[in-house]
Amino acid sequence: MNYLFKNGRYMNEEGKIVATDLLVQDGKIAKVAENITADNAEVIDVNGKLIAPGLVDVHVHLREPGGEHKETIETGTLAAAKGGFTTICAMPNTRPVPDCREHMEDLQKRIEEKAHVNVLPYGAITVRQAGSEMTDFETLKELGAFAFTDDGVGVQDASMMLAAMKRAAKLDMAVVAHCEENTLINKGCVHEGKFSEKHGLNGIPSVCESVHIARDILLAEAADCHYHVCHVSTKGSVRVIRDAKRAGIKVTAEVTPHHLVLCEDDIPSADPNFKMNPPLRGKEDHAALIEGLLDGTIDMIATDHAPHTAEEKAQGIERAPFGITGFETAFPLLYTNLVKKGVITLEQLIQFLTEKPADTFGLEAGRLKEGRAADITIIDLEQEEEIDPTTFLSKGKNTPFAGWKCQGWPVMTIVGGKIAWQKESALV
C-alpha cells in the first residue's frame, strides 16, 4: 500500500518545523514536500499533526526468550509501535543469553517471526553474562549483533573489559555498558540519599556508577574503542564523560526519560514502581543530567524499557526487581515536562529520540529522507491524555507515572511503509 500524508508538519534538514506532505511508495519515503499529488496512494490527512521520523531506542528489554511472563517480542514491539518507536535495540539479559551462534540464531528467528518494529539485538560481552569468558564477537557480528554489552551487570574485571574493547574496535563495533562497581552497591534498592535515610533502606551511592565509568573511559582510550554509557544518572558521571569528550575519547552516553523527569524527592513512598537501576538520584544529579543533555555531553535519550509482572513488583521495594516500562509513555512525558516547560525545544527532543541515536551507531534511521525506509511516527501534540497502565500494550504495567496528564501522543506508527499501530479514529 502507498500512502500520501497531507497537511502535516515535520523537522527539515535545517532543524526547523515546517509544513509538509509526505509520500510513501513501495515501503520507502518517495517525497517530502508541500502540495504533493499522487495516483495509487491512500490519502491520509494528518490535519497539522507532527510527521516525525520513527523513534529510535537503543536500550530496551524484551525479555524473550526466558522471561515471557514479563514481556514477549510480540507484546514489547507492539508497545514500542504504540509509543512511536520503529527501531529498538534489545539487551541480552535473556535466558538463554545471545552469547553464541545457536542462541543468536534462535533470537533472530523469533524477531523475524514476531516483531512489529525493527529489532536490533545486542550480543553479550561474556558467556552467560558471567564476566569470566568472552564471547565470539566475530560470530555474533556476522549474525547481526548491534553492539556488545553485558547490560544489567557491569563488567567487573578490567582486563576482560579491555580485551573486549580491543576486539570490538577491530570489528568497528561499540561496547555498551551498564556501569556499577559491585563492591559499592551495598545491596541497595534506592539512591543513597535523603529517601534511603528517611525509610531506613540500603542505598546505592552515586560514586558506584561514576567510578566505573571513569575506569571504562580510560580503558576505551587505551583500546581506541567506541564506548557507550547506558542510563547516566549522576552529576559525577556527567562530569567524567564531559572531560573524556573534551580529551577526544570515543565516548557517548544516554539518559532515560524517568531520570530527566524525576528525582528522589518525587518518590512519594516506598513504592516499587519507583524502583529502577540506576535509581532516581538527588536534585543536583537531575540538574546535571539536563545540563549534560543540553551541552552535548549526553547524546541521546533511551527508555530502558524494563517490564515486570504485578506480582513481582508487589514484593515490596527491597525485594521487587528493578525497572519500569517506558515505550508507551516516553514521548508524551518528555514533551509535556521538558518541551512544554521550556527546558528543551521540540526540535531537540526529536533529535534526541531519532537522529542522535541513529547517527551515533551508524543506523540508516532517524531522518525523513527520500529513498529511505518509511519508518514514520505521526504525533498529535495537542492531544492530552492521562497515563493509564491498564491500557498499555506491554505486559508490564509497572510505571511511576500512572495518573499523570500528558500531551503529545503518537497516533500512528509506520514501519517499512506498513502501518504497525494506529490509534482508533485518530486521523479521521
Swiss-Prot record:
It catalyses: (S)-dihydroorotate + H2O = N-carbamoyl-L-aspartate + H(+). Keywords: Hydrolase, Metal-binding, Pyrimidine biosynthesis, Zinc. The active site is at D304. Its cofactor is Zn(2+). InterPro entries: Amidohydro-rel, DHOase, DHOase/Allantoinase_Hydrolase, Dihydroorotase_CS, Metal-dep_hydrolase_composite, Metal_Hydrolase. SUPFAM superfamilies: Composite domain of metallo-dependent hydrolases, Metallo-dependent hydrolases. GO terms for cellular component: cytoplasm. Its EC number is 3.5.2.3. It holds the Pfam family Amidohydro_1. Gene3D superfamilies: Metal-dependent hydrolases, Urease, subunit C, domain 1. Substrate binds at H61, L62, R63, N93, N277, H308, F322, G323. Zn(2+) 2 binds at D151, H178, H231. Zn(2+) 1 binds at H59, H61, D151, D304. Binds 2 Zn(2+) ions per subunit. CDD domains: DHOase_IIa (cd01317). Pathway: Pyrimidine metabolism; UMP biosynthesis via de novo pathway; (S)-dihydroorotate from bicarbonate: step 3/3. GO terms for molecular function: allantoinase activity; dihydroorotase activity; zinc ion binding. The keyword Hydrolase applies. GO terms for biological process: 'de novo' UMP biosynthetic process; purine nucleobase catabolic process. Catalyzes the reversible cyclization of carbamoyl aspartate to dihydroorotate. Belongs to the metallo-dependent hydrolases superfamily. DHOase family. Class I DHOase subfamily. This is Dihydroorotase. It comes from Bacillus cereus (strain ATCC 14579 / DSM 31 / CCUG 7414 / JCM 2152 / NBRC 15305 / NCIMB 9373 / NCTC 2599 / NRRL B-3711). The gene is pyrC.
